[in-house]
Amino acid sequence: MIENVKGLLLAANGWFKDEIVQTIEKLGYAVNFKILNAADFGVPQSRERAIFICSRYGKISLPEPTISERTTVRDAIEDLAYLESGEGSFEQNYITEPKSEYQKLMRKNSKRLYNHQASNHKQVAIEKLKLIPPEQGKEFLPEELHGKQKFKTTWGRLKWDAVSPTIDTRFDASSNGTNNHPFLNRAITPREAARIQSFDDVFVFVGSKVYVRKQVGNAVPPLLAKAIADRIAEHFGLNREENQR
C-alpha cells in the first residue's frame, strides 16, 4: 500500500501517478488507487489522501465509507481534562467518564491517560486567543494582530460539532492553522491530536516534542488503515476476526 497527499494524483497532469502505476505494474502487481477521506471511516478529521493498493493476486478495490454519520471533535475530545496553556503532565488519571461511543472506543483497555500536556504558549499568543470567540478564527483579530501568516485558517479554533481539518506536524502551535481548542486559549495537546487521528489511548507517544508531533501528524489514521486492511482481507477470503489475529 502507498499513501500520499491527494495532489499526487493530479500533479504534473498525472505524470507522477502514471509513473508509479507503470513502475509497479512492471514488477508484476495489479494496482488500484483512489482518494479516501478518513472522515468517511469514523475518524473525526477531514483528511483526504491518495491510496494505492498493489497486489500480485488480482486488483483489490478500495473500501467504501463505513459510517453514515461523521464523528465530531466533541465526540473525540470532550472527555479530556480542560487544560490551560502549560498545564497537564505526561501521565495522569481520567477525571470524567466517556461521553460518546468514540470516547469509549478510544479508552478501551486504557487505565491511564498519556500525552495530554498543553503547550506553554507565550503570553502574546494567549492574549490573541482571548480575542477569538469559541469556534471562530482570525477574522475576529484586529488587522494589526494578523501577523505574517496570510492563510485565513491561521489562529482558528476547532468546531465542536464538526470534523477537524487535517492534523499536521505543527498542531501544537496556536498560529499554525485551525488547531486551537474550541474554547480554551491554547492549541490542542498531543493526546487530543492523537484522538482526532483515531489513535486510541493505549498508544503512548515518546521522544522529543518534535518527534511526537511527527508521529501523530504524519500517520495514516488507524481507523482508515483498519478499513483498508479489512478490504484486503476480504479480497483474500479472510474474515475480520482472522484479520485481527
Regions found by a protein language model. Give the residues of each.
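Class I S-adenosyl-L-methionine
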Residues: 1-145
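C-terminal target-recognition/interaction regions appended to catalytic cores
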Residues: 101-245
